[in-house]
Amino acid sequence: MSSTKVLVADANSTDGTREIVLGFRDRLNVSVIPGGMPSVGRNLGAAHAESTYVLFLDADIELAHPSVVRRAVELAQRKQLHCVTTNILCRDGNWIDKLFYAGNDFFQYLSRLHHPFATGMFMLFNLKRFRQLRGFHEQVAFAEDYLLSQQVERKRFGIVRGGVFTTNRRFQKMGHLRVGWLFLKTAMNYWNPNYFLRDHKYWQT
């Protein structure tokens, strides 16, 4: 990992993120860059990339298995994929949280039959294809990962087993019904770019 460039996009956080990240410089080739909303921060990170693939990770996730990154890259290389994602797991949530994430995983597998979607929590992208698609739409504040990944051809999309652990923070803030309704509306509006440009109050709760 010492030769792998790691970029952390920090949107002026006040929780010591920058200091914590830079504390790993003796083990990792890590830098902190200016961030913003998820689309902006991810695009800024990708602009520094020089490798064949770029991996986008949310800061609050944890890999469920240490080999998931390696296997995602191997899958992308073996099948010449443009985008690879993985399953979402909720280790500390209740059964409803886990049920919702299991439903998300089910629809993610199902999406390969129509328009693929990858979670931004873990999204490995072929850098050349990412730039051809012009990256994440920076005027989109919600489901920017869905909007980008659905442009990937079905045969160029893959899901690697292993998963990432996330929290139930979003469910606690918004409630299961609202999160579920937003998910369904997004899936039903995959064809409507104006839907993604609306303010869904996702980051205001």
Residue ranges with predicted function:
Residues 66-96:
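Conserved donor NDP-sugar-binding/catalytic core segment of glycosyltransferases
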Residues 153-205:
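Hydrophobic helical membrane-anchoring modules
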Residues 142-148:
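Acidic donor-binding loop at a coil-to-helix junction in glycosyltransferase catalytic cores
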Residues 3-12, 33-35:
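Short beta-strand/loop segment that forms part of the nucleotide-sugar
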Residues 33-49:
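Glycine-rich, basic loop-to-helix element that forms the pyrophosphate-binding segment
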Residues 54:
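Short aromatic/hydrophobic "clamp" motif used to bind/position activated sugar donors
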Residues 10-18, 61-62:
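A conserved acidic beta->alpha catalytic loop
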Residues 83, 88-95, 106-125:
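A recurrent flexible, glycine/aromatic-enriched loop bordering the glycosyltransferase active site
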